[in-house]
């Protein structure tokens, strides 16, 4: 596929939906069998990272509930469409996955570190969802200045806020 297509966004939406369906089915299977923890083992990125290493990838496409899925889907369409139109399908998917995986790993490591400090009331946390990938797309849009002539270019700041 050549540049200028929104197809990668549609593909990701389909992947999100398929993974969510698998999560629901795995949850049902875990509830009626002795497979408690199946969904977490397949999709939730949690410390220690080496225990279920595939979750570095699968957690990017999984979601906690339907609201989480829908909010990430809307953000993906808003921020992903301009990026998808500016790059190739392969680069778009690779960028999204790397941003999402890196964000998840950093969040898990950061909360694990903070939980070890006596002055911080923090617990090591588990993560899942496409927010890291979506924010990576937003960062790309802001850093590449693609928004300046369209959305962000039409917003004027008061003199006190401008640099």
Predicted regions and their residues:
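A detector for small-residue-rich transmembrane helices and their helix-helix packing motifs
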Residues: 1-163
């Amino acid at each position: 596929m050549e540049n200028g297509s929104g197809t990668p966004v549609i593909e990701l939406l389909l992947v999100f939906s398929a993974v969510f369906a698998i999560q629901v089915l795995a949850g049902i299977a875990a509830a009626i069998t002795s497979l408690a923890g199946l969904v977490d083992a397949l999709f939730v990125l949690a410390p220690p990272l080496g225990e279920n290493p595939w979750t570095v990838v699968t957690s990017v496409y999984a979601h906690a509930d339907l609201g989480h899925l829908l909010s990430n889907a809307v953000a993906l369409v808003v921020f992903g469409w301009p990026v998808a139109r500016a790059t190739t399908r392969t680069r778009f998917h690779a960028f999204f996955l790397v941003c999402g995986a890196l964000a998840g790993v950093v969040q898990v490591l950061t909360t694990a570190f903070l939980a070890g400090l006596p002055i911080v009331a923090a617990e090591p946390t588990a993560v899942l969802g496409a927010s890291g990938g979506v924010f990576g797309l937003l960062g790309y849009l802001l850093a590449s200045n693609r928004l300046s002539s369209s959305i962000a270019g039409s917003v004027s700041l008061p003199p006190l806020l401008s640099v």
